[in-house]
Amino acid sequence: TDGEIVSRTAGMLGKPLLPWQRYVADVAGEIDPATGTYYYDRVVLSTPRQCGKSTLIDTEDTRNALLGPDRKIYYLAQTGKDAEKHFKDFVQQLSKSKLAPFALKPRLSNGGMEQRFGNGSFICPLAVTKVAGHGTQMDKFTIDEAFSLDDETGKLILDGMAPTMNTRLHFTGVQPQIWITSTEGTADSTFLNGLLDSFRAGNVPTRTCWFDFGIPDDADPEDFQTILKWHPAAGLLWDVRQLRDFREQFAGNEAGWARAFGNRRDNGV
């Protein structure tokens, strides 16, 4: 697995991996002995909020950018504003890290942001609307907060990207990866809901790995001990005292609380 190198990358970025992040990195980075490159071409990650998902995405993107020359890494968010905020936070972290010498000066102009590295690779943030239906050459791309997509938009993105993956695999020798990451959404999150429901029913494609962190269906999201037991970052990024503060922020919004910290879908009932 490539997980050990991802872990070292995280340390050099100044954000050592939490146990759950290392587990995901180890599995997602498994190497196919028949090809010598990544076994999985698709990684689906469903997590509660406040768990360090963004840190893992940034670490995986950085590792992928440094895998070889002229690699193309894209981070997709619901809007351009969301993507660019995430990108600016990452660039700031990178600039202060031990990996800064490998990075060139970032381009921060609106609509044209990218972080290039000395080897010619780049990481670029985009709004999903800029990508849907368009084939883009890429080595790794992440659809973050996938709950925001309806089924048609999500499939348009995947259908546009899939043909380019074989081209890049042939050109670089490294299996491209699509990452789909999100907290559970609502009944309107038809793209993500379809994926998760299919996986939970046991219909997981051979080259897809998926991770589903959250409270069990029969658990009480108002029980703090339940949240502490099942949230992958409990006691690591925050404690029970902070959990009480988080709950107060969701006063009068029980479904929003269960969704954010239990990763439970809000079906509006």
Question: Whereabouts are the PLM-identified features?
Answer:
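Phosphate/NTP-binding elements of NTP-utilizing enzymes
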Residues: 1-269
